[in-house]
Swiss-Prot record:
UniProt-listed CDD domains: GIY-YIG_UvrC_Cho
Subcellular location(s) of the protein: Cytoplasm
Xref: SMART domains: GIYc
Function statement: The UvrABC repair system catalyzes the recognition and processing of DNA lesions. UvrC both incises the 5' and 3' sides of the lesion. The N-terminal half is responsible for the 3' incision and the C-terminal half is responsible for the 5' incision.
Family classification: Belongs to the UvrC family.
Gene Ontology CC annotations of this record: cytoplasm; excinuclease repair complex
Record InterPro entries: GIY-YIG_endonuc (IPR000305), GIY-YIG_endonuc_sf (IPR035901), GIY-YIG_UvrC_Cho (IPR047296), RuvA_2-like (IPR010994), UVR_dom (IPR001943), UVR_dom_sf (IPR036876), UvrABC_protein_C (IPR050066), UvrC (IPR004791)
Protein name in the entry: UvrABC system protein C
Domain of life: Bacteria
HAMAP family given in the database record: UvrC
GO molecular function, one term: excinuclease ABC activity
Amino acid sequence: MPDQPLNRTTIPEKKLSNLPTCPGVYQFKNNQGTIIYVGKAKNIRSRVRSYFREGPHISGKTKVLVNHIADIDIILTSSEVEALILENNLIKDLKPRYNINLKDDKTYPYLVITNEAFPRILITRQVKRDGSTYFGPYTEARQLRSVLDLISTIFPVRKCKLKLTKENIESGRFSVCLNYHIHTCKGPCEGKQREEDYLRMIEEIKGLLKGKTGALIRTLSAEMHRYADELRFEEAAELKIQIEGLRKYTERQKVVSKDPVDRDVFGIAQHQDDACGVIFKIREGKLLGSQRMYFSNVDDEQHETLLRKCLEKYYLETPDLIPQEIFLPLPIDDDEVMALRELTGDINLRFIVPKIGEKAKLVAMCIDNARHHLEEYLIEKQKRGELSRIVPALQALQETLHLSRQPERIECFDNSHFQGTDYTSSMVCFVGGKPRKSDYRKFKLNSFEGSDDYAAMQEAVTRRYSGSLQDELPLPDLIVIDGGKGQVNTAWKVLQELGLEIPVIGLAKRLEEIFLPNTPDPYNLAKTSPALKLLQQIRDEAHRFAITYHRKLRTKRTIQTGLTDIAGIGEKSAMKLLEHFGSIEQIAKAEKEEILAVTGPKTAEAILSYFRKKQP
């Protein structure tokens, strides 16, 4: 069956047919005139028409996009590379809804060698097309510090901001600073260092930053020997220090390939709407570092599209670091290869998809790193999402309960007992809407006899807000009681007696009603209220903590009253038996062979003997 047209009623066939066949950028607009997608093409007409043809290659996201296209604008360029650069800039500026969003990496720093007489080496977060040479971005601050320390140690690069023109230097306008006297600068400001010597040093630094440490060491070694032969021992000694520093730096780099070819390795990982691309920079067989970039709004985009975005962005921003080979996890089309070769200025640049051996392992390692960084990114994204949920909940609590401030610290009490015995209370603490488990506390209650829920609450609140715990933990902004009117009033009275003005509320389970002290009628929050959802989360956590503690106490008492009386059985052995059989009754019914599966023959015999004596 031939391909069928999509959305042809919106975009007239005549308009599609009249589109030019040259390179450029196309912009899709919706019926409000908003640009919703930007793309680039070697042949605009062919590329745009492909969106309006039904077929297996059309993704769900593309179908949705096409259904929203009301108009098309184009911008012609002289080459596909110009189109690529323009597309990149337009996407950054316009952030169209249906484009893959590249997370802005402007927070990552670059090293820049300035385009001026006697260039300086600076850190910047903005890449400008000003003739300067940029290296980076450095996603790891430690890596950037390591490189800067190395350069400062072995290369006397000027650190001043002086405008060192030939006229300014010859006029004697400047004087050397402290850096000259401590031998970290050779004084070009006073003409003590020739510009050609300074620029030779800058080229050596560029070689270092490009990973050409082996070639640099060989060049410096030859120069050192020449100085020594010419009896210029001081200059030879300076070069020796530089060479030793370079060798130490090289030794710290991880060797990942036996052959000394310069390579970039790309890896991609995707999860639902997010993706991460990682690039390994390998120079002379050593891994110099890695860069990563994150994408959102990828939806059902194919990996080929994500890989293309990674390649384009990376080589747009780092045109001075082109390797001999680029390893990819999957192939890209020939047009993209040609565009990237034109972009980098290297028509011999090789794109390789390794299948076996060491090279394939490099790509696999890069993909593993992309997965790892994507997982970390998603965790952080989830945390940000939780924060965006928690802040409105805390604000709603403050407004609903008429609190003087936002309840940053909330403590919640829940009591537990078994048929009126083994009373316990748990207190959980939430700070900023999140559990702070280090501040959880549990209380074994024993100041009263029989079944008395109010006495239990009185003891728990008294013990928390008096004595050593009062000094050990900060006071909360809000106290939540798992209970109704009577429980809340009991807690409030204790606080009054202790002279504490802390807001306290109760949250009853059955109807999720909120009770305030000395107020007969409960307050009801909407079921969808973020404040109620946060209170429920805190209350449920207090209940979980209370039940866990109470169960542990009951188990311990069961052990002490039923098993530890048997010779040779301590608490650990008793716990092991209970975990295996489930109860003392089941242990009493067990055969010797069953008990031997858990303990030794002597202990098994003691258990059987103990329960025989208890039989009527």
